[in-house]
């Protein structure tokens, strides 16, 4: 994609997976199951900050942008678009594409990628 459009690729850590470095590996699955069931108001502050940073970055994109990311980042964005009370909205299919159209920092329309319950162990 970068070669086709003669663009450089860079990694923006804003779109890193949900912060969980302080959670023991053996407890991460249960932790994530709990997180996706929570109301956004009940989420740990670091998750709230993570989600706000992601959506802010999306809304302030100044040009056409392609973001490759994890399913929880995609869920965070879509849950904000849908004004959901949960950070978890759907199971994006592998290689699904969600499109967001902005005008002057405002979402004017969006298309959610294919939803498929993939094997995520949740």
Question: Where are the model-predicted features located?
Answer:
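Terminal low-complexity/intrinsically disordered segments and their adjoining alpha-helical capping regions
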Residues: 1-122
């Amino acid at each position: 994609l970068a070669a086709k459009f003669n663009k450089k690729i860079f990694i923006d850590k804003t779109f890193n997976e949900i912060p969980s470095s302080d959670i023991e590996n053996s407890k991460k699955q249960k932790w994530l199951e709990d997180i996706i069931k929570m109301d956004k108001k009940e989420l740990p502050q670091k998750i709230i900050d993570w989600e706000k940073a992601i959506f802010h970055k999306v809304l302030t994109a100044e040009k056409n942008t392609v973001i490759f990311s994890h399913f929880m980042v995609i869920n965070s964005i879509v849950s904000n678009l849908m004004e959901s009370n949960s950070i978890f909205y759907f199971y994006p299919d592998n290689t699904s594409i969600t499109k967001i159209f902005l005008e002057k920092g405002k979402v004017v329309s969006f298309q959610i990628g294919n939803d498929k319950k993939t094997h995520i162990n949740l």
